[in-house]
C-alpha cells in the first residue's frame, strides 16, 4: 500500500543536491574521468565533488550549471573552493564577466515550491540515467 506521507522540504533539497551533483560531475566527464575545474587534477567522477563558485546558501545559484563545476576535495574543501582560481576559470570558459554576473545573481532571492524542486529532481535524474 503506497504511503501518502508528504516528503519534507529538507529531504527534497538534499535529493536534488545529490542528483544535481551527479549530473554536474557526469556532464563534465569523459570515460568516467573528470578534471578539477581549479587545479586540473584528473580522477574518476565519483571521487570528485560538485564545487560551487557562489555558496549553496544562495538558492538562485545553488543549482546553476555555470556556478557549479567539478572540483577535487582538496580544492573544494581544504582550499575553500579556490574562489580566485574558480572566478578566473569561469571567465575564461564562459566569457569575461561571468563570475561577476554569478555574484549578482546570487544576491537575488528566489523561492522554489516543493513541486518545482520535485520537477528539477525528475529532470536531472533523467539526465543522469541517460548518461
Question: Which residue ranges define each predicted feature?
Answer:
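Short Cys/His-rich Zn2+-coordinating modules
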Residues: 14-26, 50-58
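Short Cys/His-centered divalent metal-binding micro-motifs
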Residues: 40, 44, 68-95
